[in-house]
């Protein structure tokens, strides 16, 4: 069962460009990189050379005689004489290149040679990426891949493009969903949120029609992350990295969701955990939401370095890390319980990052003015409020009406609500979050 992914169109566009460079695909483990690359290769090439450096150690010495195309291809065929290189008809797939990052140095030669298309990928590229980047600067294209978003989940469920496009139409026309539409999309979004976007987890759910077995798969992925820390986190305290990661659910459950090191360990200090958060971000496991000094443009230079929130990159993995009672209530009764606010924020943060948005929030100390997210468009700043209830959006109204904040002309509220508009505030259901960038583009905000 192959799931249609957004990278599919990108790969076709990449190949269609007559001057395309070698491609490096980055992303966390088990998000479907290899499946998508192989699917593309089988559809478009007569000859595929697939090398997995994690599983096939015989290929680790292919650079022994240099980085030129002739030496590399010769050593590959020495390691496996069944491999053939057919100019203009072959694609070379280097997988798990974090195990052999110097392979990136060959991309310059392959680019100049022009006889073979090359795609590199790996689960922990963020960690070794500075080394990989310096080895291939000017000779590659980067693509960051994520776990499945809500739209990809709907594709996997069999929904047609026009059905999915209707969500954006409702937003643009400010037209409320009817009761049936709202109920169905809310149910689908809640199922997606519980599952997350890991393809193996989604596949298990679609094959059985239930959540049975999905939690075991999610728990294994989190255990695999622990192993990655122990294997790849050189020069850092591995136990502290794992402790930071495991503390995030409790951090988000606080009323003040700002990340605090004293919640990781008693009397912990930020300097003791230097590099731990960056490691998790580079691995594609977590997201960082920066606190703005002022809710205004520009965003660069307008960040309070010591204030931030951390979210899981995949909300399904966040849910799988909750206590057993909360998980059971959510999976069986669809009740988010005390974690409601935290989960809704993580849903939205994940949707934003997968659309290419940066994450920013604002909280004024010793004051009630705060906002969950801000989205930057071409010349405006859009505050986005995530409400676990239908209460009035006082902070949004205050930001919009304050003449000091000239960059803000309207706001967006995402909640357990229908489509609506009042007092410069657009209201959308949570499941609309994945369409926000398209919505703003259609409104000519970009």
Language model: regions and residue ranges:
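N-terminal pre-Walker A segment at the start of P-loop NTPase domains
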Residues: 1-16
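Accessory nucleic acid-recognition modules appended to NTPase machines
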Residues: 203-370, 374-378
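Hydrophobic positions on the alpha1 helix immediately C-terminal to the Walker A/P-loop
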Residues: 36, 40
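Short glycine-rich substrate-engagement loop in P-loop NTPases that contacts/grips substrate
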Residues: 55-87
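Structural recognition of the conserved hydrophobic beta-strand(s) that form the central parallel beta-sheet
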Residues: 117-123, 144
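Interdomain motor-coupling "hinge/lid" segment immediately C-terminal to the ATP-binding subdomain
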Residues: 130-253
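Conserved lysine of the Walker
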Residues: 33
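Conserved catalytic segments around the Walker B and adjacent sensor/switch elements
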Residues: 44-59
């Amino acid at each position: 069962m192959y799931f249609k992914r957004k990278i599919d169109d990108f790969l076709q566009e990449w190949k269609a460009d007559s001057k395309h460079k070698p491609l490096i695909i980055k992303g966390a483990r088990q998000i479907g990189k290899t499946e998508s690359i192989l699917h593309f290769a089988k559809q478009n090439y007569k000859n595929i050379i697939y090398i997995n450096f994690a599983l096939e150690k015989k290929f680790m010495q292919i650079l022994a005689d240099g980085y030129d195309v002739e030496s590399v291809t010769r050593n590959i065929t020495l390691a496996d004489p069944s491999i053939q290189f057919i100019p203009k008809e072959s694609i070379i797939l280097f997988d798990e290149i974090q195990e052999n990052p110097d392979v990136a140095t060959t991309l310059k030669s392959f680019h100049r040679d022009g006889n073979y298309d090359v795609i590199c990928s790996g689960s922990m590229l963020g960690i070794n990426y500075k080394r990989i980047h310096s080895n291939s600067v000017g000779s590659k294209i980067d693509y960051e891949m994520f776990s499945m978003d809500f739209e990809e989940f709907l594709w996997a469920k069999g929904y047609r493009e026009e059905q999915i496009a209707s969500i954006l139409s409702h937003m643009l026309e400010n037209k409320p969903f009817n009761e049936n539409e709202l109920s169905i999309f809310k149910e689908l979004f809640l199922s997606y949120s519980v599952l997350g976007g890991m393809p193996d987890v989604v596949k298990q759910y679609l094959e059985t029609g239930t959540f049975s077995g999905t939690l075991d798969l999610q728990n294994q992925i989190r255990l695999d992350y622990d192993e990655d820390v122990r294997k790849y986190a050189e020069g850092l305290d591995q136990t502290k990295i794992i402790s930071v990661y495991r503390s995030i659910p409790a951090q988000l459950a606080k009323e003040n969701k700002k990340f605090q090191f004293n919640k990781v360990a008693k009397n912990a200090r930020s300097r003791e955990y230097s590099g731990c958060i960056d490691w998790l971000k580079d691995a594609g496991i977590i997201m960082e939401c920066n606190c703005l000094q002022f809710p205004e443009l520009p965003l660069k230079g307008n960040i309070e370095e010591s204030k931030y929130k951390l979210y899981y990159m995949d909300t399904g993995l966040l849910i799988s890390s909750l206590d057993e009672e909360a998980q059971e209530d959510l999976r069986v009764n669809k009740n988010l319980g005390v974690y409601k606010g935290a989960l809704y924020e993580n849903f939205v943060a994940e949707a934003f990052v997968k659309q290419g948005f940066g994450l920013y929030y604002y909280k004024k100390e010793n004051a009630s003015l705060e906002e969950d997210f801000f989205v930057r468009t071409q010349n405006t700043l859009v505050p986005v409020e995530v409400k676990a209830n239908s209460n009035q959006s006082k902070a949004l109204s205050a930001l919009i009406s304050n003449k000091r904040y000239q960059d803000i002309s309207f706001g967006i509220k995402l909640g357990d609500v229908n489509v609506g508009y009042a007092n410069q505030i657009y209201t959308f259901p949570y499941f609309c979050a994945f369409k926000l960038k398209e919505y703003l583009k259609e409104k000519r905000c970009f």
